[in-house]
């Protein structure tokens, strides 16, 4: 079998993570096209076959070998007790570039202050196994019921407390719920089937994918700046650039001038560019960065 007809089976998360995942892959250089109601995206890489499936099931199917590689949360790996290779941490979520939290929450009016106060109470959640382990670790005996969704509406009539995932806590506050404790922080992970990981071609393909995806995450919120400057202003200019690394300085044909290139955080650019101009920089050029590889 030649490399030209080898294929890596990729599982992509369907649902809340779908759009942010496809956007991340696009920045990494993999462009998917998803037709309405289709679970089989097309991709501009003949060595990849992708299927959309719920993140909750991903680790299970990667373990079975239905997928060589997939993306899911640390939470679902733990919840399903899946035996997979955790290739890379990809810290992004539905609406932000940060981890999510599974939290224990109760109605604002509830007397519950800690998990200990839930002895003999009823808890609703999607992560039954994680919740049971958490209760056991705290010596609490409470009943845990699987929730099919809309978990925030269940207290106080259908449950005394819930364990729910949140990025900002806004949905919980909107439903008049109060966070008692954080049970687990979770982020997206690139995971691989153990047999696939032992295949040299598949492993190299997976590692390359991980490198590009991590590079796309590293580049989020960053831009590049290029500019020319007289040597006499170089020290002043470099002193005001809060760079991720020291600027790259290149000599120009005019030996009294240099070219500078630097990567900075995008949110400071509107303040930084006028300062650079006043310090003597010319020909300032800002450009987007898709990937930043360490």
Curated annotation (Swiss-Prot):
Molecular function, one GO term: ATP phosphoribosyltransferase activity
Residue intervals passing through the bilayer: none
Primary location recorded for the protein, binned into one broad class: cytoplasm
A GO CC term assigned to this protein in UniProt: cytoplasm
Location(s), subcellular: Cytoplasm
Cofactor(s), names only, from the UniProt record: Mg(2+)
Pfam families the UniProt entry points to: HisG (PF01634), HisG_C (PF08029)
Annotated catalysed reactions: 1-(5-phospho-beta-D-ribosyl)-ATP + diphosphate = 5-phospho-alpha-D-ribose 1-diphosphate + ATP
EC number: 2.4.2.17
Inhibition and activation profile: Feedback inhibited by histidine.
Swiss-Prot/TrEMBL GO biological process terms: L-histidine biosynthetic process
Keywords noted in UniProt: Amino-acid biosynthesis, ATP-binding, Cytoplasm, Glycosyltransferase, Histidine biosynthesis, Magnesium, Metal-binding, Nucleotide-binding, Transferase
Gene3D superfamilies named among the record's database cross-references: 3.30.70.120, Periplasmic binding protein-like II (3.40.190.10)
Pathway linked to the protein: Amino-acid biosynthesis; L-histidine biosynthesis; L-histidine from 5-phospho-alpha-D-ribose 1-diphosphate: step 1/9
Root EC class: transferase
Known function: Catalyzes the condensation of ATP and 5-phosphoribose 1-diphosphate to form N'-(5'-phosphoribosyl)-ATP (PR-ATP). Has a crucial role in the pathway because the rate of histidine biosynthesis seems to be controlled primarily by regulation of HisG enzymatic activity.
Xref: PANTHER family: ATP PHOSPHORIBOSYLTRANSFERASE, ATP PHOSPHORIBOSYLTRANSFERASE ATP-PRTASE
Record NCBIfam families: hisG, HisG_C-term
Membership in a protein family: Belongs to the ATP phosphoribosyltransferase family. Long subfamily.
Name this polypeptide is given: ATP phosphoribosyltransferase
Species this chain originates from: Chlorobium luteolum (strain DSM 273 / BCRC 81028 / 2530) (Pelodictyon luteolum)
